[in-house]
Amino acid sequence: MTLFSSISSMSTSMSGSKSSISSFGSGTSMGSNSIACGGCGGSGGILGSGLGLGLGLGLDLTGGSRSRGACGGNRGNGNGNGGMGGGNGSCCGGPCCGI
């Protein structure tokens, strides 16, 4: 059984030319060969700086599952820290939970 939830928020930058999308995702895997991954940052940025923020939390309950952190969006920072079991910060736009 795999439980995945994500909360996204969008805000307009001060310059009004770009928007910043930040997302937080949490995944809990309760079976072998399951994948729990975090959220994915969006494109655009704060004050036009092109910063994508992503926060991810992966919790491995079995020891045999894979947990992945989050990654930044387009032109953003890919700082992904996985939970228990290791992490992979390059899941944005990849096969990690379809995000």
UniProtKB/Swiss-Prot annotation:
Q: Please list the GO biological process terms of this entry.
A: sorocarp development
From the UniProt entry, list the residue stretches annotated as the region Disordered: 1-29
Instruction: Show the disulfide pairing.
Output: none
Q: Which domain of life is it from?
A: Eukaryota
Q: Which PANTHER family match?
A: HSSA/B-LIKE PROTEIN 1-RELATED-RELATED, HSSA_B-LIKE PROTEIN 1-RELATED
The UniProt entry's sequence similarity note says:
Belongs to the hssA/B family.
For this entry, the protein name equals HssA/B-like protein 42
Q: Which organism is it from?
A: Dictyostelium discoideum
Q: Gene encoding it?
A: hssl42
